[in-house]
Amino acid sequence: KVDKVELLRMYNDLKLLSEVYPKLSVIGSGGNINKLFRISEFPKGRPLTTVKLREELDMLSAIPVKERLRKFDLKPDRADVIVPAAELYLQIAHHVKATEIWVPTIGIVDGITYSLCEQYLAEHPNWDK
């Protein structure tokens, strides 16, 4: 559970960021947003809209945790936190005035590794010779 003072501080910071950078995009990373994206059935490479995420939140909130486990093949440690996670993502998007959340299908560590490999190959075109 997140302290309300910390949430308010974060929301204030997000508001300030959105004033400096008016066209911010939200990028979600981690198990909860990945599962929410899969449940949404949005095509890969497309952002999850906040409208769709709100629909998912409403649907998941109406379902008991035990049914979420079965219906969406959620792990026990995910089934009870996915609703608050969706709420948090929606709040973040709201405070930066974003209508979409980009959900990469590659993890952060994998993405960094991929980026480093691309950079190395660009700098060393004959590495395999």
Stretches with model-predicted labels:
Residues 1-129:
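Helical "lid/coupling" subdomains associated with nucleotide-phosphate turnover
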